[in-house]
Structures are given as C-alpha cells and as structure tokens.
C-alpha cells in the first residue's frame, strides 16, 4: 500500500534464461510462495510455448483479453494472499489493439483507410508481438490489482529482444522522422497526419516502457541457469546484456543441482554405473559453479535441488523453493549507471570523464557512437542509448578505453558552444 492508502503499482519480476533450464517452474514456484506469504500475485507467460498451465497443473488458456485464472487463494482474514495466472496471446492482443487504434483514428481522420489494413498483416513487423506483450505486463502492473507480477519470459534471445525493442524503436522513429517534424504536419495533409498521430501514440507507449524497465524499484530480472557449461556461459553474457540495458538483476537461481551429502564419501562407491554417473555429475556441477565464481565473482546464488519427482502443482512448487538454499555472496552486477567527473583542467582546457561499468561484455564487440545529446553503446548484439550529462553535450569525444569491465570516455569542451 502507498502512503495514501491506495494500492501501489505492482513490482514486476522477469524470469529470464536459456530454454529448458526451468524458468516456468521457478517463476511459478516463486509466485506460489509469495501468495502463501500474503501477497496478491499474478504469474504471466509471454512465451508463446505457454507451459505455465502445465507447471501449475491447471488449464491456463492463452488469451488477449487479460482475464486471469485463479490458481489458489488463502484466507484473507488470516493474512493470506492469492495467485492468478495468465497466458498472453500476443496475436489476439495485436488484433484487439489495432482495431481500437483504427476506430479512434478514423473518428479523428475520416477516410484514413487504416481500416483496410488487417491485423494479420501487422504480424510480419519484427518485434511487434513482443512489445505488445511487454506493454500488457506494464498495464497489468499499473492496474494495482496485484502486489507482484511474475513474468515467465521466453528463452534468452527472445526475452532480450523483448526488453530492448522499446528503446530501439523509439531511437529509430526519432531518427527517421523527428518529433518536431511530425507535430508540424498540417491538418490538410490527412494521410501524413494519421501516420504522425499513430507514431506519436506508439512513441509515448514505448517511452513509458523504457522508463519502466530501468526503474529498479519496480522491475527486476531473475536469471535462471543450470550447472552446465553451455548454459552458464550464456547466463554470464545475459548478465552483461541486462546491465547494459539498465535492467536490475535481483538474483541468480541455479536449478537442478544434485544434492550432495557432505558426510558421505563419494569416492567409495559400489561398482555400478548409476553411482559413477551421480558422482561424476556432482563433480561436473561443482566445477561449473567454480568457473562461474571465477568469472562473475562470489555472487549470491539460490541453489535449487534436482528432485526425483517433477514439481507440478502449487503444493509441489512451494516445496521446491522450501528445499532450496541460499549461498551468501555479493549482489549481482548492477545496471549501467553513468558517472561523470572532471579529470583535469578548467574552462576550454578541461577534460571530463564519463565512466560506465560494463560487466561480462566481450570487449571485441564493443562499439561507441554519438547521436546529438546521446552516447550509443553497443556490445554483444545489444545497444543502449545513454543521455549525456548537460556539461558533456557541449563537448566532443577525446578518446575511450575499456579496462577491467569499466568503460571510460573522455571529453573536451567544444569551443563553438562552450560558454565563455
């Protein structure tokens, strides 16, 4: 609840990871535990595979109407919460949103002919379904019906594309048709006015999404991995990508970890393949975790055991996290936060420095660019537009270097615009 007594906007928890690591299971388990702790929780699937209902053990049919299924509810008088589930049908979302937009714009601009474009034709536009799914999650959080929205995202590549599209779309729309030009379109140019109004609506929506995603108080990512080398390598890259995008990582969950009894000597085993396999897998998993520590540091981990039975249904899911243990350590790498200071000099002889922490990014993929008042940072297939501090907007770039995961860009004043 907020100070005014009205429900606060729900926190959004994004469960991200490689396909098959157990995102749906751990997202559902987290939602079940939060509901049991008295919270009003909604778990949402944006993955078109939609295995959420399979994990929860109930039917959760995909829908574009935003009508959730009640999974469980505890006694509210005893402080219990409830859990709802929703599988987003982004194709149905697209159809509903497009028909609403056409109806609204047709009233303002009769004869626009937007109604001649079928929603099915828009499906070919890259990323439109992902953006609509993310927009729907934002609307659900703003509805204040729940305290927490747990999002079961698609596999890593699709999830990262979903998270980067709002900022990317806004960037290219502004470059292709700047806002001041769009707003100067006269009413006599009906077709251009319709297009300008449509883009303005989209721009406002994606701008709100970009702002929401980088609000660490409301949005966080939960990175799920298994103790396997290929999966761990992708998780490390994902950490860097999320940091570059400005999304706060709340925790790393290592799923399907074989339980090891410290009081048992695993080297003295009966001569049977099952025992040898178990001991070898434990050793491999331990080696993967050691390599992970060497790469990202002693980061806190949630260690989820590999159970004999598949956890399906609220009771089993709640027990899964009850059996997990937390390994203490440092917080995951934080999102990109620019730090600006004066390195030396004064006036036109000043040298200013912009520092950005870029953890777990491949230096060979790092490129920089500048567009007006923004610094464009690209790495590992991701791109982030960083608004420069006011003092740096009147400067030109002197040089840049990357050392130990920290990017330093130096600036010198531009005599043509520097105040005298």
Swiss-Prot record:
GO terms for molecular function: ATP binding; ATP hydrolysis activity. Belongs to the arsA ATPase family. Gene3D superfamilies: 2.60.40.790, P-loop containing nucleotide triphosphate hydrolases (3.40.50.300). Pfam families: ArsA_ATPase, ArsA_HSP20. InterPro entries: Anion-transp_ATPase-like_dom, ArsA_HSP20-like, ATPase_ArsA/GET3, HSP20-like_chaperone, P-loop_NTPase. This is Protein Rv2184c. CDD domains: ArsA.
